[in-house]
Amino acid sequence: MAKIGFIGMGNIAYAIMRSLLNKYKTEDITFTDLNRRRVAQIEKETGVKAVDTNQDCAENAKYIVLAIKPQFYDNVLADIKDHVTKENIIISIAPGITIDSVNEKLGGDRRIVRAMPNTPALIGEGMTGVCYDKKLFEETEKQMISNFFESFGMMEIVPEYMMNAVVCISSSAPAYIYMFIEALADAGVKYGMPRDVAYRMAAQGVVGSAKMVLETGKHPGALKDDVCSPGGTTIYAVSVLEEYGLRNAVIKACDACYEKCIDLK
């Protein structure tokens, strides 16, 4: 029996599975996906063998990862309802889908972990918000859950009411950050820099800045102030970002993301 089964193999699920293969054997993992061409490609790339149906996946893995879009949840949960037991641990990674809603559709009395990872999981640098009822899990299972998510980056245990916020500021954040990197690089190209050099410089600036926040423990505002010399070039750039509403644009974007999470319920 496989330890981990993925129902659905989109970008996030694939990123997670690739990272898990650094710790688990190929025979410990299985998956299903409707796209047969993608199934064949993933089997060839990873050595992980797919099973034919969602029911097969549920019956052949203890940890079942629901890696499907929210609009497909009802059909998939109905599909596997009679094939999961109290021994299974269901890991749901769809935005807006609550633990109670998954549990209810599986007949109740099931053990659900709700999580929201992001795509940097593909290179082992993911961030995942996780919530579950700890009373329902053995210590060895809790450790397995931690090992699962930490195999592709960092994790934070959060209360479930924060999960929509996790989507906004972490799961969706790579898209915002890629836009920022692209904008910086476009500016570099405007000034005559080769595009590949501009991308590397902009991306490393983001990586290094993020590490400064994580490793120094200093407030981001204080780190910003450290770069801004009185009357210098950086404070002039910062003043323009403030004038054009960078902070407000980011918060408004997160507001839109949050509202969409609510709609997905």
Where are these regions (language model features)?
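NAD(P)-dependent Rossmann-like dehydrogenase/reductase catalytic/cofactor-binding core
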Residues: 203-265
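NAD(P)+-binding Rossmann beta1-loop-alpha1 motif at the extreme N-terminus of oxidoreductases
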Residues: 1-52, 56-59, 125-126, 189-191
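Small-residue helix-packing motif on alpha-helices
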Residues: 29, 39, 57, 194-201, ...
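Rossmann-like NAD(P)(H) cofactor-binding subdomain of soluble oxidoreductases
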Residues: 37, 46, 54-59, 63-130
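Internal alpha-helical scaffold of NAD(P)-dependent oxidoreductase catalytic cores
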Residues: 101, 105-111, 127-166, 178-215, ...
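Short pre-catalytic strand/loop immediately N-terminal to key active-site residues, enriched for Gly-Thr
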Residues: 113, 163-168, 220-225
